[in-house]
Amino acid sequence: MLPAPTGSDSGRAPRSLRGMSDQPHPPIVEFAFPGPLRDTLVAAILDGTKTSTTSTLVEYSIEDEPLPVVGTRQTVVDSDDSAVAVIETTSVEVAPLASVDLQHAVDEGEGYTSVAEWRAAHERYWQGEAMRAWLGDEHFTVDDTTMVVLERFRLVEIL
């Protein structure tokens, strides 16, 4: 996927890392568009507070990308496109937006203290101008029935 949005951190964009070293790296994953949000999310991954992420299912279908698979490793990049960490997917669930629970919201590492707070932030992101432009749908909205991909991961290595 393009550096597009996953949850308020949307933008899971696996691609290969070339020319960064002689050792092979797992595919790249990008959290959000480059900028302050991505930098915040990457910092939360590096300090261990971010261990989950959420994407709309439509993000995967737009890019014709398969869903994450448990055990898959990905290289996290920062806003400068520098490889900073390797994460490993530990669980994947596709569910309606209304079913996201507090633990998943908290584990996104953005300081959410309620599902309502998490959802409001994610709705702003998913219904924001950048996401709508990326999706090619200026009227894109989410509701309780919108299918989302709930992914959990662990930090494997800081690069």
Mark where each language-model region is.
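Mixed-charge, low-complexity intrinsically disordered regions
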Residues: M1-V86, V92-L159
